[in-house]
Design a protein with these regions (language model features):
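N-terminal cofactor/phosphate-binding cores enriched in small/glycine residues
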Residues: 15-69
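Eukaryote-biased recognition of intrinsically disordered, low-complexity regulatory segments
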Residues: 2-13
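A structural connector/turn signal
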Residues: 12, 38-41, 143, 187
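Short glycine-rich loop/turn motifs that provide flexible caps or phosphate-binding loops at active sites
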Residues: 11, 19, 46, 172, ...
């Protein structure tokens, strides 16, 4: 059996995989959508959001960290797993301040698109309405900490690609938050630039370029035209 002939089962369908693939990587390559937030194809898996949780041979596991091997039986799109994903999404929405109608990221936001995909029509839980700052100290980039989902993509991009290590995650439990690695804690006191990988990696609306709001009209944005699962199918 060649590398490309190896396969595992995803929701009853045989999926090919390459050596070193995770379940999520293999599924994404062939256009099979497994919901996720913190995973990005250019970075090592993080496994923090748990949205990609699947059942592997009957046991729950994160699809972004489980290595694909022959004879795996993976379940993803089941009523039970999608209900769990919806609950996790609802918790993310109430834990932050996500006001989609007025957010510049609306239509391009992976959190919003995933909530639509999972049929989330309300937060269900009581809103926290946390008091979080907006950092406008940088001349070209705005940081709105209200929307952070702690995916750490900006942390990894700044450290591993830009070589600047401008962001970190600090605190514990409900107090966990995104930090700027400067003496003042302000982005304006760093050398971050718009061309940095970290400047464009945020899946929600935390890191935004200034003076570019709504350049692409609502209704013509990435997930306005097609759902997140349809985009996954297009990439195959």
């Amino acid at each position: 059996m060649t590398v490309l002939e190896q396969s595992f089962s995803l929701d009853g369908e045989d999926l090919p995989f390459q050596a070193g693939d995770t379940v999520l990587q293999a599924a994404t390559r062939v256009g099979r959508y497994i919901p996720h937030l913190c995973w990005h194809p250019d970075f090592a898996p993080h496994g923090s959001c748990r949205i990609c949780t699947v059942k592997v041979n009957g046991k729950p596991a994160a699809a972004c960290t489980v290595m694909a091997t022959p004879r795996l039986d993976v379940e993803s799109h089941t009523e039970e797993l999608n209900a769990q994903r919806k609950t996790l999404l609802q918790m993310l929405f109430v834990e932050g301040n996500h006001f989609c109608p007025s957010c510049e990221k609306s239509g391009n936001c992976l959190l919003q698109a995933t909530a639509y995909e999972m049929g989330m029509d309300g937060p269900h839980f009581e809103e926290f309405y946390p008091d979080r700052p907006v950092d406008a100290s940088h001349p070209d980039i705005l940081l709105d900490f209200n929307r952070c989902i702690l995916c750490e993509l900006c942390v990894r991009a700044s450290r591993d690609v830009d070589g600047k290590n401008l962001f970190a995650i600090g605190g514990h439990g409900i107090g966990t938050r995104l930090l700027v690695n400067s003496d003042s804690g302000r982005l304006g006191d760093t050398d971050m630039g718009l061309s940095d990988r970290a400047a464009g990696i945020c899946p929600v609306g935390v890191i935004l370029p200034k003076r570019r709001g709504f350049v692409i009209p609502i209704g013509e944005r990435l997930y306005d035209r097609k759902s997140v699962s349809e985009h996954a199918q297009d990439r195959s």
